[in-house]
């Protein structure tokens, strides 16, 4: 429930205002969240009267989402689907006015293929929001989830070679399941340059993008005030090492 509340608060306070710099979200909107987890990001859109669909491969998290949102007055306006987005067709769920991927793209394998298929769920005016940690940032490998307090606070740990990274995690007493999850993130983590190369190749139009020195979500988790990275520090490749989050709005 804690993570659900963190998601809901950050989306309500930062993500929705960011999107509304480009488009006003109205009750007529159909909203798709890919990788919805426990549904915290969906709650603020239900508050706005939107029709929502949440897709995730984690059945347990989806059951939590249903439980947490069951008392919401707009619960009948949300549908949850337990599946891989790559196995879902637009014939099944249709197209959407807004698609949300928050802290998700860095977990998806074959990102080029995914970004191509994403268009199947878009009409000409669909806007897609991406929020993701750049791979090379101090905690881009999500190793802050480690139980070992030293490892969870060690910046850039995930940039070690795979074999050494695995050994360090084992030394730190992490479970085999957590080690495997962190190694999978290492396989799919995405750099800013690579993300931009993919959207350029797929001919998406970038409506807005923002580099964050301090991720907006860090305010909810750690009490740190969000901070946009100054333009003069947005140095290609180098800024990947200190940009903790990117926000993007794109369309076809």
Regions found by a protein language model. Give the residues of each.
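Active-site beta-strand termini and strand-to-loop segments that position acidic
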Residues: 250-252
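Helix-to-beta-strand junctions that scaffold the AdoMet/dcAdoMet cofactor pocket
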Residues: 108-109, 122-123
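A short beta-strand submotif of the Rossmann-like class I SAM-dependent methyltransferase core
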Residues: 101-102
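Short glycine-/acidic-enriched loop or helix-start segments at secondary-structure transitions
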Residues: 43, 64, 110-111, 139-141
């Amino acid at each position: 429930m804690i993570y659900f509340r963190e998601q809901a608060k950050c989306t309500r306070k930062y993500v929705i205002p960011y999107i509304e710099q480009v488009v006003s979200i109205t009750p007529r909107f159909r909203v798709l969240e890919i990788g919805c987890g426990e549904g915290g990001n969906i709650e603020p859109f239900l508050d706005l009267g939107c029709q929502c669909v949440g897709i995730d491969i984690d059945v347990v998290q989806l059951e939590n989402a249903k439980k947490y949102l069951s008392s919401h007055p707009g619960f009948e306006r949300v549908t949850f689907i337990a599946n891989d987005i790559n196995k879902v067709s637009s014939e099944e769920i249709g197209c959407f006015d807004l698609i949300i991927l928050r802290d998700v793209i860095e977990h998806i394998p074959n990102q080029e293929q995914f970004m191509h298929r994403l268009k199947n769920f878009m009409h000409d005016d669909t806007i897609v929001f991406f929020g993701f940690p750049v791979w090379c940032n101090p905690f881009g490998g999500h190793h802050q989830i480690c139980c070992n307090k030293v490892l969870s606070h060690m910046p850039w740990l995930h940039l070690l070679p795979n074999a050494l990274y695995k050994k360090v995690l084992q030394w730190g007493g992490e479970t085999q399941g957590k080690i495997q999850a962190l190694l999978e993130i290492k396989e799919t983590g995405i750099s800013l340059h690579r993300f931009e190369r993919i959207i350029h190749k797929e001919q998406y139009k970038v409506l807005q993008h923002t580099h964050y020195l301090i991720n907006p979500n860090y305010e909810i988790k750690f009490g740190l005030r969000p901070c946009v990275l100054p333009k003069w520090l947005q140095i290609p490749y180098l800024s990947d090492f200190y940009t903790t989050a990117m926000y993007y709005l794109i369309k076809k």
